[in-house]
Amino acid sequence: LSQTPKPANREIVSASLRLLAMRDMSRMEFARKLAAKAFTPEDIAAAVVWCEADGWLNETRYAEVTARRLGHKYGATRIAQTLKQKGVPNGAVAETLSAMKDGELARAQAVLERKFRDAPSNAEQRAKQIRYMQTRGFSFDVIKRAMCAAAAAGAALAEPFEADD
């Protein structure tokens, strides 16, 4: 435990621990939830400092957990946007996204495969798939590579069946 003194208001200590025991959250989100309970700004500031010093409130951990949770559905752009909306500092966002960068293509392929079972047969379907993936926060480069990989996998699966004709 840290040397930071516990806030004098016992109610805010109890409320803080209850909130943070449920799930991780950013400083901004934590302060907003405490403010909704009508605590004074001074008590909220003291609680934030105390929780950070004792390791209850950790924005880097929050960013990692949130990115992992959202990573199955969304790309780096959307994850970064969500983290910034929650008040996570840019440094923590960049650090988290750089750790996830290697798996971006695999995640895009999984999302593409879950939503669209078949490769696009015309330009309209291709544009629809690209738009869908862009709204999910994947970059055009990653989308293009994921679609090429899916098309190559589909062609490889289809070749033996076509040869039997």
Residue ranges: model-predicted function:
Residues 1-165:
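An alpha-helical, amphipathic repeat domain used for nucleic-acid recognition
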